Protein backbone atom coordinates (compact mmCIF):
# COMPACT_ATOMS: atom_id res chain seq x y z
CA UNK A 1 0.00 0.00 0.00
CA UNK A 2 1.64 3.29 -1.11
CA UNK A 3 0.24 5.28 1.82
CA UNK A 4 1.20 2.84 4.56
CA UNK A 5 4.17 4.89 5.86
CA UNK A 6 1.91 7.84 6.65
CA UNK A 7 0.49 5.71 9.40
CA UNK A 8 2.50 6.29 12.63
CA UNK A 9 1.89 2.67 13.60
CA UNK A 10 4.10 1.70 10.66
CA UNK A 11 6.43 4.68 10.46
CA UNK A 12 7.69 4.52 14.04
CA UNK A 13 8.57 0.78 13.96
CA UNK A 14 10.19 1.30 10.55
CA UNK A 15 12.49 3.97 11.99
CA UNK A 16 13.00 1.99 15.20
CA UNK A 17 14.20 -1.05 13.25
CA UNK A 18 16.74 0.99 11.30
CA UNK A 19 17.88 2.76 14.48
CA UNK A 20 18.39 -0.55 16.29
CA UNK A 21 20.46 -1.87 13.38
CA UNK A 22 22.65 1.23 13.15
CA UNK A 23 23.08 1.40 16.93
CA UNK A 24 24.60 -2.08 17.00
CA UNK A 25 26.67 -1.60 13.84
CA UNK A 26 28.20 1.64 15.17
CA UNK A 27 28.64 0.28 18.68
CA UNK A 28 32.25 0.55 19.93
CA UNK A 29 34.19 -2.67 20.33
CA UNK A 30 33.03 -4.61 23.37
CA UNK A 31 35.29 -6.49 25.80
CA UNK A 32 35.92 -10.11 24.92
CA UNK A 33 33.84 -12.72 26.68
CA UNK A 34 35.03 -16.14 27.81
CA UNK A 35 33.32 -19.37 26.77
CA UNK A 36 32.98 -22.42 29.08
CA UNK A 37 36.25 -23.80 27.69
CA UNK A 38 38.12 -20.69 28.83
CA UNK A 39 38.67 -19.29 25.34
CA UNK A 40 38.26 -15.57 24.67
CA UNK A 41 35.50 -14.75 22.18
CA UNK A 42 35.29 -11.33 20.56
CA UNK A 43 32.30 -9.79 18.80
CA UNK A 44 33.39 -8.82 15.29
CA UNK A 45 31.95 -6.06 13.14
CA UNK A 46 30.06 -8.71 11.17
CA UNK A 47 28.69 -10.15 14.41
CA UNK A 48 27.39 -6.76 15.56
CA UNK A 49 25.82 -6.17 12.16
CA UNK A 50 24.17 -9.61 12.28
CA UNK A 51 22.67 -8.85 15.70
CA UNK A 52 21.44 -5.50 14.43
CA UNK A 53 19.91 -7.13 11.36
CA UNK A 54 18.16 -9.63 13.63
CA UNK A 55 16.57 -6.76 15.60
CA UNK A 56 15.63 -4.87 12.43
CA UNK A 57 13.91 -7.88 10.88
CA UNK A 58 12.20 -8.82 14.14
CA UNK A 59 10.78 -5.33 14.65
CA UNK A 60 9.60 -5.05 11.06
CA UNK A 61 7.98 -8.48 11.17
CA UNK A 62 6.25 -8.00 14.52
CA UNK A 63 4.81 -4.60 13.60
CA UNK A 64 4.14 -5.57 9.96
CA UNK A 65 6.01 -2.55 8.64
CA UNK A 66 6.54 -4.20 5.26
CA UNK A 67 5.17 -7.39 3.69
CA UNK A 68 6.89 -10.46 5.13
CA UNK A 69 8.52 -11.33 1.82
CA UNK A 70 9.95 -7.84 1.36
CA UNK A 71 11.51 -7.95 4.83
CA UNK A 72 12.93 -11.39 4.01
CA UNK A 73 14.61 -10.10 0.85
CA UNK A 74 15.89 -7.09 2.80
CA UNK A 75 17.77 -9.47 5.09
CA UNK A 76 19.74 -10.87 2.16
CA UNK A 77 20.42 -7.43 0.66
CA UNK A 78 21.62 -5.97 3.97
CA UNK A 79 23.93 -8.93 4.51
CA UNK A 80 25.55 -8.20 1.16
CA UNK A 81 25.66 -4.42 1.53
CA UNK A 82 27.21 -4.47 5.02
CA UNK A 83 29.48 -7.43 4.20
CA UNK A 84 28.00 -9.56 6.96
CA UNK A 85 28.40 -12.53 4.64
CA UNK A 86 29.68 -13.04 1.15
CA UNK A 87 27.10 -11.81 -1.36
CA UNK A 88 26.98 -15.11 -3.23
CA UNK A 89 26.43 -17.07 -0.01
CA UNK A 90 23.82 -14.67 1.38
CA UNK A 91 21.69 -14.59 -1.77
CA UNK A 92 22.16 -18.25 -2.68
CA UNK A 93 20.34 -19.20 0.53
CA UNK A 94 17.13 -17.98 -1.11
CA UNK A 95 17.46 -20.89 -3.53
CA UNK A 96 17.84 -23.46 -0.75
CA UNK A 97 15.57 -26.52 -1.22
CA UNK A 98 13.85 -25.81 2.12
CA UNK A 99 12.82 -22.36 0.85
CA UNK A 100 11.25 -23.88 -2.26
CA UNK A 101 9.56 -26.52 -0.14
CA UNK A 102 8.00 -23.77 2.00
CA UNK A 103 6.85 -21.96 -1.14
CA UNK A 104 5.32 -25.19 -2.42
CA UNK A 105 3.40 -25.81 0.81
CA UNK A 106 2.02 -22.26 0.68
CA UNK A 107 0.92 -22.77 -2.92
CA UNK A 108 -0.86 -25.99 -1.95
CA UNK A 109 -2.73 -24.09 0.75
CA UNK A 110 -3.60 -21.32 -1.69
CA UNK A 111 -4.92 -23.88 -4.19
CA UNK A 112 -7.13 -25.51 -1.55
CA UNK A 113 -8.55 -22.15 -0.50
CA UNK A 114 -8.96 -20.78 -4.03
CA UNK A 115 -10.84 -23.81 -5.35
CA UNK A 116 -13.07 -24.08 -2.26
CA UNK A 117 -11.76 -27.48 -1.17
CA UNK A 118 -11.06 -26.19 2.33
CA UNK A 119 -14.67 -25.12 2.84
CA UNK A 120 -15.96 -28.35 1.33
CA UNK A 121 -13.90 -30.47 3.73
CA UNK A 122 -14.76 -28.27 6.70
CA UNK A 123 -18.51 -28.33 6.05
CA UNK A 124 -18.41 -32.09 5.50
CA UNK A 125 -16.66 -32.59 8.84
CA UNK A 126 -19.22 -30.39 10.61
CA UNK A 127 -22.10 -32.45 9.28
CA UNK A 128 -20.68 -35.40 11.25
CA UNK A 129 -20.41 -33.52 14.56
CA UNK A 130 -22.63 -33.61 17.60
CA UNK A 131 -24.30 -30.36 18.64
CA UNK A 132 -22.83 -30.58 22.17
CA UNK A 133 -20.45 -27.68 22.74
CA UNK A 134 -17.53 -29.78 24.11
CA UNK A 135 -17.78 -32.00 21.03
CA UNK A 136 -17.94 -28.92 18.81
CA UNK A 137 -14.69 -27.80 20.42
CA UNK A 138 -13.15 -31.19 19.70
CA UNK A 139 -14.48 -31.32 16.16
CA UNK A 140 -13.30 -27.80 15.30
CA UNK A 141 -9.85 -28.48 16.73
CA UNK A 142 -9.55 -31.89 15.05
CA UNK A 143 -10.70 -30.39 11.75
CA UNK A 144 -8.10 -27.61 12.03
CA UNK A 145 -5.31 -30.05 12.87
CA UNK A 146 -6.35 -32.38 10.03
CA UNK A 147 -6.20 -29.60 7.46
CA UNK A 148 -2.67 -28.69 8.60
CA UNK A 149 -1.53 -32.12 7.42
CA UNK A 150 -1.92 -30.92 3.82
CA UNK A 151 -1.50 -27.14 3.89
CA UNK A 152 0.28 -24.40 5.83
CA UNK A 153 -1.24 -23.73 9.24
CA UNK A 154 -1.55 -20.01 8.48
CA UNK A 155 -3.68 -20.81 5.43
CA UNK A 156 -5.75 -23.22 7.52
CA UNK A 157 -6.42 -20.56 10.15
CA UNK A 158 -7.51 -18.08 7.48
CA UNK A 159 -9.80 -20.67 5.88
CA UNK A 160 -11.35 -21.96 9.10
CA UNK A 161 -11.94 -18.52 10.65
CA UNK A 162 -15.16 -17.72 8.69
CA UNK A 163 -16.52 -21.18 9.48
CA UNK A 164 -16.01 -20.65 13.20
CA UNK A 165 -17.79 -17.32 12.89
CA UNK A 166 -20.83 -19.18 11.54
CA UNK A 167 -20.70 -21.57 14.51
CA UNK A 168 -20.42 -18.73 17.01
CA UNK A 169 -23.23 -16.75 15.38
CA UNK A 170 -25.48 -19.77 15.81
CA UNK A 171 -24.36 -20.07 19.43
CA UNK A 172 -24.86 -16.35 20.17
CA UNK A 173 -26.98 -14.65 17.46
CA UNK A 174 -26.49 -11.20 19.05
CA UNK A 175 -22.76 -11.31 18.38
CA UNK A 176 -21.98 -10.73 22.05
CA UNK A 177 -18.51 -12.00 23.11
CA UNK A 178 -18.72 -15.34 24.91
CA UNK A 179 -16.38 -17.78 26.62
CA UNK A 180 -17.28 -20.31 23.95
CA UNK A 181 -16.22 -17.89 21.23
CA UNK A 182 -12.93 -17.16 22.95
CA UNK A 183 -12.23 -20.85 23.38
CA UNK A 184 -13.21 -21.61 19.79
CA UNK A 185 -10.87 -19.09 18.19
CA UNK A 186 -7.98 -19.32 20.65
CA UNK A 187 -8.15 -23.11 20.51
CA UNK A 188 -8.20 -23.02 16.72
CA UNK A 189 -4.98 -20.99 16.68
CA UNK A 190 -3.30 -23.31 19.17
CA UNK A 191 -4.34 -26.53 17.46
CA UNK A 192 -3.29 -25.18 14.06
CA UNK A 193 0.20 -24.89 15.51
CA UNK A 194 0.00 -28.29 17.18
CA UNK A 195 -1.18 -30.05 14.03
CA UNK A 196 1.36 -28.31 11.83
CA UNK A 197 4.28 -30.22 13.38
CA UNK A 198 3.00 -33.58 12.11
CA UNK A 199 3.94 -33.21 8.43
CA UNK A 200 6.35 -31.01 6.55
CA UNK A 201 3.45 -29.37 4.72
CA UNK A 202 2.04 -27.84 7.90
CA UNK A 203 4.65 -25.18 8.61
CA UNK A 204 7.92 -23.73 7.40
CA UNK A 205 9.86 -24.54 10.56
CA UNK A 206 9.93 -28.28 9.83
CA UNK A 207 11.57 -27.91 6.43
CA UNK A 208 14.03 -25.33 7.77
CA UNK A 209 14.92 -27.54 10.74
CA UNK A 210 15.58 -30.51 8.45
CA UNK A 211 17.75 -28.29 6.27
CA UNK A 212 19.87 -27.35 9.30
CA UNK A 213 19.95 -30.99 10.41
CA UNK A 214 21.26 -32.13 7.04
CA UNK A 215 23.85 -29.34 7.00
CA UNK A 216 25.12 -30.25 10.48
CA UNK A 217 24.97 -34.04 10.31
CA UNK A 218 24.91 -34.90 6.62
CA UNK A 219 21.87 -37.12 7.22
CA UNK A 220 18.42 -36.67 5.72
CA UNK A 221 15.01 -37.26 7.27
CA UNK A 222 12.25 -38.44 4.94
CA UNK A 223 8.72 -37.07 4.70
CA UNK A 224 7.17 -40.08 6.43
CA UNK A 225 9.97 -40.42 8.96
CA UNK A 226 9.30 -37.04 10.55
CA UNK A 227 5.57 -37.79 10.57
CA UNK A 228 6.23 -41.12 12.31
CA UNK A 229 7.91 -39.33 15.22
CA UNK A 230 5.84 -36.14 15.32
CA UNK A 231 2.32 -37.55 14.86
CA UNK A 232 1.98 -38.92 18.43
CA UNK A 233 3.15 -35.59 19.86
CA UNK A 234 0.88 -33.55 17.60
CA UNK A 235 -2.20 -35.68 18.35
CA UNK A 236 -1.46 -35.56 22.09
CA UNK A 237 -1.10 -31.77 21.99
CA UNK A 238 -4.44 -31.37 20.22
CA UNK A 239 -6.15 -33.61 22.78
CA UNK A 240 -4.59 -31.77 25.74
CA UNK A 241 -5.49 -28.40 24.23
CA UNK A 242 -9.09 -29.54 23.86
CA UNK A 243 -9.21 -30.48 27.55
CA UNK A 244 -7.58 -27.20 28.57
CA UNK A 245 -9.89 -25.03 26.45
CA UNK A 246 -12.96 -26.97 27.63
CA UNK A 247 -12.03 -26.23 31.24
CA UNK A 248 -10.73 -22.66 30.98
CA UNK A 249 -13.29 -21.49 28.41
CA UNK A 250 -16.22 -23.57 29.57
CA UNK A 251 -19.20 -22.77 27.28
CA UNK A 252 -22.18 -20.98 28.77
CA UNK A 253 -24.53 -23.33 26.87
CA UNK A 254 -24.42 -27.09 26.59
CA UNK A 255 -25.26 -27.29 22.86
CA UNK A 256 -25.75 -25.37 19.61
CA UNK A 257 -29.13 -26.39 18.17
CA UNK A 258 -29.31 -26.65 14.40
CA UNK A 259 -25.55 -26.72 13.79
CA UNK A 260 -25.62 -29.98 11.86
CA UNK A 261 -28.52 -28.82 9.71
CA UNK A 262 -26.74 -25.53 8.98
CA UNK A 263 -23.54 -27.37 8.01
CA UNK A 264 -25.54 -29.68 5.74
CA UNK A 265 -27.17 -26.66 4.12
CA UNK A 266 -23.82 -24.93 3.57
CA UNK A 267 -22.30 -28.10 2.16
CA UNK A 268 -25.21 -28.59 -0.22
CA UNK A 269 -24.83 -24.97 -1.33
CA UNK A 270 -21.36 -25.76 -2.67
CA UNK A 271 -22.88 -28.08 -5.26
CA UNK A 272 -21.15 -31.14 -6.72
CA UNK A 273 -17.38 -31.30 -6.71
CA UNK A 274 -15.93 -29.35 -9.63
CA UNK A 275 -13.23 -30.22 -12.16
CA UNK A 276 -10.94 -27.61 -10.58
CA UNK A 277 -11.29 -29.27 -7.19
CA UNK A 278 -10.64 -32.71 -8.66
CA UNK A 279 -7.62 -31.34 -10.53
CA UNK A 280 -6.27 -29.78 -7.35
CA UNK A 281 -6.65 -33.06 -5.46
CA UNK A 282 -4.85 -34.98 -8.22
CA UNK A 283 -1.99 -32.47 -8.47
CA UNK A 284 -1.49 -32.26 -4.70
CA UNK A 285 -1.70 -36.05 -4.47
CA UNK A 286 0.98 -36.36 -7.15
CA UNK A 287 3.20 -33.85 -5.33
CA UNK A 288 2.88 -35.71 -2.02
CA UNK A 289 3.59 -38.99 -3.83
CA UNK A 290 6.82 -37.56 -5.22
CA UNK A 291 7.79 -36.17 -1.81
CA UNK A 292 7.23 -39.50 -0.11
CA UNK A 293 8.59 -41.77 -2.86
CA UNK A 294 12.03 -41.97 -1.27
CA UNK A 295 10.48 -43.56 1.83
CA UNK A 296 9.45 -46.52 -0.33
CA UNK A 297 12.24 -46.45 -2.93
CA UNK A 298 15.45 -45.37 -1.13
CA UNK A 299 17.38 -45.38 -4.43
CA UNK A 300 15.55 -42.21 -5.43
Positions of the model-derived regions?
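Juxtamembrane and boundary regions of transmembrane helices in multi-pass small-molecule transporters
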Residues: 3-32, 114-117, 173-190, 194-209, ...
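Hydrophobic mid-bilayer segments of alpha-helices in multi-pass membrane transport proteins
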Residues: 11-21, 46-84, 96-107, 159-163, ...
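Hydrophobic alpha-helical transmembrane segments
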Residues: 23-28, 58-63, 146-149, 271-272, ...
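Short, hydrophobic transmembrane alpha-helix segments
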Residues: 25-43, 59, 63-65, 88-89, ...
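Helix-loop junctions at the membrane-solvent interface of multi-pass transporters
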Residues: 27, 62-63, 81-82, 129, ...
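Membrane-embedded alpha-helical segments and adjacent helix-loop junctions characteristic
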Residues: 35-39, 56, 69-175
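Transmembrane alpha-helix interface/packing and boundary motifs in multi-pass membrane proteins
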Residues: 57-67, 143-152, 189-201
Amino acid sequence: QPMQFRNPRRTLPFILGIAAFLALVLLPDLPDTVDPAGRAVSLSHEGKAALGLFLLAGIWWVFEVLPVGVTGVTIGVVQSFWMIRNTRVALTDFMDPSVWFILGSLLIGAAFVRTGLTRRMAYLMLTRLSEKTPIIYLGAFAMTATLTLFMAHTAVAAAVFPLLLVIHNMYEPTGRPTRFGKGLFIGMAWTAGAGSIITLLGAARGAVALGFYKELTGSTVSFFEITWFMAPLGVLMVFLLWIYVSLVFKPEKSEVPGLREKATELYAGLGPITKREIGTILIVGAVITVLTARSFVPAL
